[in-house]
Amino acid sequence: MFKTILLLAFWGRFRLGELTVPAQDNIKIEDTVLRLDVDLIGEEHQEQFLRVWLRKEKAAAHRAGSLVEIPKLPANLKKLCPFRTMTRYLQRMDKAGMSRFDPLFTDLSGSAMTPGKFSAGVKDAIRTTMPNIGQELFKTLKNHSCRSAIPTICQELECFIDKDILKSLGRWESDAYLQYLKSYQGALKTRRFVEEEIIKKISEARKQDAVFFRQT
């Protein structure tokens, strides 16, 4: 379950609070991703997607939810593929009798995943698998660590994604995604790139206008 949550949050740019419930005695159906909100789309040897209906977004409560699609990753990334991991998780939970109206991440005892339980599980896994650095590594992890991953990776690889595309992928209403960039220089590079693209587009538009007026 923990791996499924991590991969879903990473590739789907989810906030942890969007995939968990505040507490066992505070489950609001209208704010929770349920089993029925998740679909696996497509057939084998065709384009396949993991589709998640997010009923309520923290930063866009005025919207009536949001549809998030994550493609099945290529074979060389299968261990990091949320589609494959979710497929196995749903098969296991459906066999165990999970209701379509249960919170998506519910264990076999019927308890839904909370932020506290998730944090404790990740902390234990890191300490167990990386005893030498696990303690220090866990200190740097935050609830938004998965959500910030895509902007950070784009920065590290110097892969400058169009601002509007990046904001759309992460469902950011503002330029808040810039806060997730891990280095000041990287943030400046991203801003400069966006500004240069704007200038370039304006310049191209002016050139087209000039050509039009010369022809007329």
Language model segments and positions:
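Acidic, Ser/Thr-rich intrinsically disordered and amphipathic helical segments
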Residues: 18, 81-88, 117-124, 150, ...
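Basic, Lys/Arg- and aromatic-enriched nucleic-acid-binding interface segment
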Residues: 1-17, 79-80
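The alpha-helix within a helix-turn-helix
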Residues: 9, 20, 167
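Catalytic-site neighborhood detector that most strongly recognizes the C-terminal catalytic loop/helix
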Residues: 168-196
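Conserved, ordered domain cores of eukaryotic regulatory proteins
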Residues: 70-119
